[in-house]
Amino acid sequence: MQITLLKSKLHRVTTTHSELDYEGSCAIDGHFLEVAGIREYEQIQIYNVNNGNRFTTYAIRAEENTGIISVNGAAAHKAAPGDLLIIATYASMDEKEAEEFKPIMVYFDEKNQITHTRNTIPKQMQQLA
C-alpha cells in the first residue's frame, strides 16, 4: 500500500513578490530549494498564514541568496507581499519506506533568513489555563 507523507516544508517564509502577469508558478530562492530538497517544477502546496488561502502550484528557481518568494500568475490573487506562507511538498511511498523516512523542514525569520532545520515536529502539548 502507498501512503503520502510530508516530504519537505518551508515554514513561515514571507512573500516578497506577487506577479499576476508572470507565467504561473512560485519562484523560490534557489538556496531554499536546495536545503529543502525541492526540485524545480515540483508540485507544491502553499498555505497562506495571513488569510487562510491554500492552493497548489509548482516551484521554479529564483536567484540564490535573494530571499525571493514570488507567487505568480493566477495564484498571485491568493498571496500579497508580506504574507507569511508555509510551502509544502509531499511524497508517496510504501509503508516500509515510510518507517525510515524523515521530512526536511526549514524554518525562517521575518527577513527570509533560514534559522534552523528539523526532521521532526515537537509533540503538541495541552496548554494549561
Curated annotation (Swiss-Prot):
The active site is at S25 (schiff-base intermediate with substrate), Y58 (proton donor). It comes from Hydrogenovibrio crunogenus (strain DSM 25203 / XCL-2). GO terms for cellular component: cytosol. The keyword Lipid biosynthesis does not apply. Catalyzes the pyruvoyl-dependent decarboxylation of aspartate to produce beta-alanine. It is found in: Cytoplasm. The gene is panD. GO terms for molecular function: aspartate 1-decarboxylase activity. This is Aspartate 1-decarboxylase.
